[in-house]
């Protein structure tokens, strides 16, 4: 399906529940690159690149998150692939 980029804004109880570390682990398992970070409004932002099918798997996972998380909503923005990332990192 081709290389793409997706930006996610994950809302709910998603900070202090290992959401970033779990997202990094899942993204690496899927072979994705990019980053994940906490936002000041209590949400988590994810920017990921890779094959569209794997990005869709990450989106599905983000709607559940790790067991301690309570995801209320995931806003998804598809973008063009940039190739700017070489791994998947936790920022901030």
Curated annotation (Swiss-Prot):
Active site: 20, 38
Reactions it catalyzes: an acyl phosphate + H2O = a carboxylate + phosphate + H(+)
SUPFAM superfamilies, sorted: Acylphosphatase/BLUF domain-like
Entry EC number(s): 3.6.1.7
Enzyme class: hydrolase
PROSITE patterns reported for this sequence: ACYLPHOSPHATASE_1, ACYLPHOSPHATASE_2, ACYLPHOSPHATASE_3
GO molecular function: acylphosphatase activity
Assigned keywords, A-Z: Hydrolase
Domain Acylphosphatase-like as annotated: residue spans: 5-92
Pfam families in the record: Acylphosphatase
Entry superkingdom: Bacteria
PANTHER family, per database record: ACYLPHOSPHATASE (PTHR47268:SF4)
Similarity field: Belongs to the acylphosphatase family.
Full protein name: Acylphosphatase
Species assigned in the record: Sorangium cellulosum (strain So ce56)
Organismal lineage: Bacteria, Pseudomonadati, Myxococcota, Polyangia, Polyangiales
């Amino acid at each position: 399906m081709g290389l793409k980029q997706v930006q996610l804004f994950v809302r709910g109880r998603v900070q202090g529940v290992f959401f970033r570390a779990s997202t990094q682990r899942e993204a690496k398992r899927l072979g994705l690159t990019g980053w994940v970070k906490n936002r000041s409004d209590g949400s988590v932002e994810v920017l990921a690149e890779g094959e569209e099918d794997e990005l869709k798997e990450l989106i599905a996972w983000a709607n559940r998150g790790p067991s301690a998380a309570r995801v209320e909503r995931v806003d998804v923005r598809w973008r063009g692939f940039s190739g700017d990332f070489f791994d998947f990192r936790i920022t901030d």
